[in-house]
Amino acid sequence: MDKKLLEILVCPLCKGKLLFKKQELICKFDRLAFPVRDDIPVMLEQEARLIPLEEKDKL
């Protein structure tokens, strides 16, 4: 993922900073993981995966 793009992208819900990990953009605050498909972030809430509490602690 392009570092410049990662610097300007934020969570669409809380506007918090995102972490790029394993083809997902992760918002620790909302516990959501947004998929990145073909280097294009899919920043739709309905496409996001809810991160279980156990997994969030490992981020």
From Swiss-Prot:
One of its GO terms (cellular component) is cytosol. Coiled coil: none annotated. Disulfide bonds: none annotated. It holds the Pfam family Trm112p. PANTHER family: PROTEIN PREY, MITOCHONDRIAL, ZGC:162634. Belongs to the UPF0434 family. This is UPF0434 protein lpg1920. It comes from Legionella pneumophila subsp. pneumophila (strain Philadelphia 1 / ATCC 33152 / DSM 7513). The lineage of its organism: Bacteria, Pseudomonadati, Pseudomonadota, Gammaproteobacteria, Legionellales.
